[in-house]
Amino acid sequence: MKKMTTLCAGLLFLLSSSVFAEEHLKEALEHANAAAVHGEDGDTAILIGHAKAALEQVLEASIVAKGVAKNHLNEAAKELQESIELANLGHIGSATLHAEAAVKHVKISDKYINSFVIINKP
């Protein structure tokens, strides 16, 4: 009986942590996309604001992510940090490229997290 309770508790934790990560990934993707779009428009300040918001959400999601998903979130965080730094230096074109790279990493991470949720749903 204790084993069954422990197993159920563990499964619930895994499912809830994946759902937690999904919420942050959605926000991160929206902000990273917005950063890239505003970068293409040359709006440095808006790019920086969205990149910072995306970075915050990526870091929150990476707390509970595991494996390949976590690796891609870490890469997305690096890309967003680089985007912010380059935008602050006035290199909007390079900053935009890093924001776009972050979008790709967040999307890949989302696929891995969603596939985990689908496999583990009762």
Model segments located where?
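Sec-dependent signal peptide recognition
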Residues: 2-9, 14
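Generic cytosolic/nucleocytoplasmic N-terminal low-complexity/intrinsically disordered segments
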Residues: 1-2, 25
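Long, charged/polar, soluble alpha-helical segments
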Residues: 13, 17-122
